[in-house]
Each structure stands twice: as structure tokens, then as C-alpha cells.
């Protein structure tokens, strides 16, 4: 079960992940054995970019990150992909190596949607997740290609190694939820892991990027399904996993 993690609404929305250059596919044969018992989750590490301050004051979220529902939402939900344990561990260790420790509150993750409305959880969100997950087979992914963000580094998935499969799942969900998605969630999507962000020193980021380019050998894994987290008054709480069908 996931641990609770405090984070601001805007941090949950992931607004700082701005690509500086697009990833290019890379060939890599590194293999990792999947484990079907893993749950991707938020860790209880030092908090990342807490924009509420020590007093716990809640800032009004930007309209870009707000679901298009008729009333203000008491809670929103974050949807990520669920991967095997070994793949998740390797990417999390890489994130811990490069992400500023005082800001790193999360384990490695690929976010599909940042602010799903809690008011539609039982009516639309979970039924759609169950339907699409039941019709989707587990698939291979390869975290292969490092690329720059404005203030950090990410690792992308080649189209033929999980990129297209992840995008297809995202597009199905996006079509089903088009009436209420936030502007951010209704926009474009490119599957990636963020391993460094929120670093203002361009020289530091570039040096780290060059090191990652030199040392990163890729990481194979298996996408087992989807994980849903509740954003609730500063906490990211694991809610439910939606498993894909076995690949064979």
C-alpha cells in the first residue's frame, strides 16, 4: 500500500515538466525481469516544491489544472501507469540520484492525467478505467532516451517500446473524459519519467544531462496496468490499481 505524500495542487499538476528538446528513439537490449506484485506509489521523502508554505495555506489552483465540472472539486485524482517492481526500483533510484533531495517527494512515475474530478469518480472515472484496463494487454516498455527539460532531465519511451502503447491508452481515456478534463490534461501527451526538475542552475542541469547520456543504458520493464491516486488537502493517497490482461 502506498504511503501518504504531501504536495501542492500545482505540484500534483506537474506544471514544471516543460521539454527543452524532444526525445529520439534509442536501441537498447538491457533486460529486466518483471514482477507482477509491484504497486507504484508516492514516497514519504522530503517534500518537493511545497507552495503552501509552513502554515498549510492552500493556494487557488490555476484554471489550467482545474477539471471542467459544474462546481469546485473537493478532491482530484492523479492517474499513472503501473509497472513491474524491478523497473520501478531502477527508475526511482535514478530519480533519487539527480532530483534535488529537498524537493524529491515522489518515486519514479509516468503520469497520464493530473487532475481527474472526484465528483465523477464512481460515475465515470472508475468504470472507464475498469473497461479499458480489461481490454488492454500488458505491454513491454523501455525507458531509453534522456532529454532535456527547461530545468531538468527526463527519460522517454521509444514509440516501438511502450511509447505508442501508452499513448493509445491515454487517447482512449482522453476521448472518454473529454467533457471534464482540465486544459492541461486535455492537451498533448508524451510518456516520460522526470528524473531531475526545478533546478535553476543551467550549468548544473547540463552537466547532469551529459552524465546521464553517457551512463544511462536503458531500462526494460512491463506495464501491468494503471494506478489511481487521490489528491486530498495536500496528500497523494493511493486509491486503486487497474490491472491489464495478461499478455499471453
Q: Could you say what each language-model-derived stretch is?
A:
Residues 2-248:
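Histidine-dependent nucleotide/RNA phosphoesterase domain, centered on the 2H-phosphoesterase fold
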Amino acid at each position: 500500500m502506498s504511503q501518504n505524500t504531501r504536495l501542492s495542487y500545482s505540484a500534483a499538476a506537474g506544471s514544471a515538466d516543460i521539454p527543452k528538446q524532444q526525445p529520439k528513439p534509442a536501441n537498447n537490449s538491457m533486460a529486466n525481469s518483471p514482477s507482477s506484485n509491484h504497486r507504484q506509489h508516492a514516497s514519504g521523502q522530503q517534500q518537493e516544491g511545497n507552495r503552501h508554505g509552513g502554515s498549510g495555506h492552500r493556494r487557488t489552483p490555476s484554471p489550467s489544472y482545474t477539471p471542467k465540472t459544474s462546481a469546485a472539486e473537493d478532491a482530484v485524482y492523479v492517474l499513472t501507469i503501473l509497472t513491474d517492481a524491478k523497473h520501478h526500483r531502477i527508475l526511482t533510484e535514478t530519480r533519487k540520484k539527480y532530483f534535488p533531495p529537498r524537493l524529491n517527494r515522489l518515486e519514479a512515475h509516468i503520469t497520464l492525467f493530473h487532475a481527474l474530478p472526484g465528483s465523477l469518480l464512481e460515475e465515470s472515472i472508475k468504470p472507464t478505467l475498469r473497461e479499458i484496463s480489461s481490454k488492454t494487454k500488458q505491454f513491454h516498455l523501455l525507458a531509453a532516451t534522456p532529454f532535456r527539460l527547461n530545468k531538468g532531465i527526463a527519460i522517454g519511451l521509444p514509440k516501438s517500446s511502450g511509447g505508442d502503447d501508452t499513448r493509445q491508452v491515454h487517447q482512449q481515456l482522453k476521448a472518454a473524459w473529454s467533457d471534464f478534463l482540465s486544459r492541461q490534461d486535455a492537451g498533448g501527451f508524451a510518456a516520460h519519467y522526470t528524473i531531475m526538475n526545478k533546478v535553476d542552475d543551467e550549468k548544473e542541469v547540463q552537466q547532469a544531462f551529459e552524465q546521464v547520456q553517457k551512463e544511462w543504458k536503458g531500462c526494460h520493464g512491463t506495464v501491468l496496468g494503471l494506478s489511481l491516486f487521490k489528491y486530498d488537502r495536500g496528500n497523494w493517497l493511493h486509491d486503486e490499481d487497474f490491472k491489464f490482461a495478461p499478455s499471453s
